[in-house]
Design a protein with these regions (language model features):
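Short, non-transmembrane amphipathic alpha-helical segments
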Residues: 7-11, 46-60
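Histidine-centered active-site/metal-ligand motif
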Residues: 28, 47, 63
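N-terminal first-folded block
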Residues: 1-27
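A short interface-forming secondary-structure element
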Residues: 32-45
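Short, active-site-adjacent cap segments at secondary-structure transitions
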Residues: 28-30, 75
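Solvent-exposed beta-strand sheet faces enriched in polar/charged residues
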Residues: 23, 32-34, 68-70
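C-terminal structural segments of small proteins and small subunits
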Residues: 52-82
């Protein structure tokens, strides 16, 4: 079974990340991904970068992935507002 930790490691291996959180039940996952690689990118392009990092795992193992993709500055603002 696919675990949140294994999804996290795959994302981190394929994308330079400052922070990654993944929760899920083995098929359905939620992720928060913070990366400088998202600077200047629209939400759709950010998600495409994460899908590319996941590669075949996204097609073969993950049924659904809900994600929040943030730059470090956006993450800091979100944490400060909380």
């Amino acid at each position: 079974m696919t675990t949140p930790e294994s999804i996290k490691r795959t994302i981190e291996a394929g994308l330079p990340c400052d922070h990654v959180e993944v929760r899920g039940d083995g098929q359905h996952f939620e992720a928060v991904i913070v990366s400088n690689a998202f600077e200047g990118l629209a939400k759709v392009r950010r998600h495409q970068r994460v899908y590319a990092a996941l590669g075949d795992r996204m097609r073969e193992e993950v049924h659904a992935l809900s994600m929040t993709t943030l730059t470090p500055a956006e993450w800091l603002l979100r944490r400060t507002d909380a």
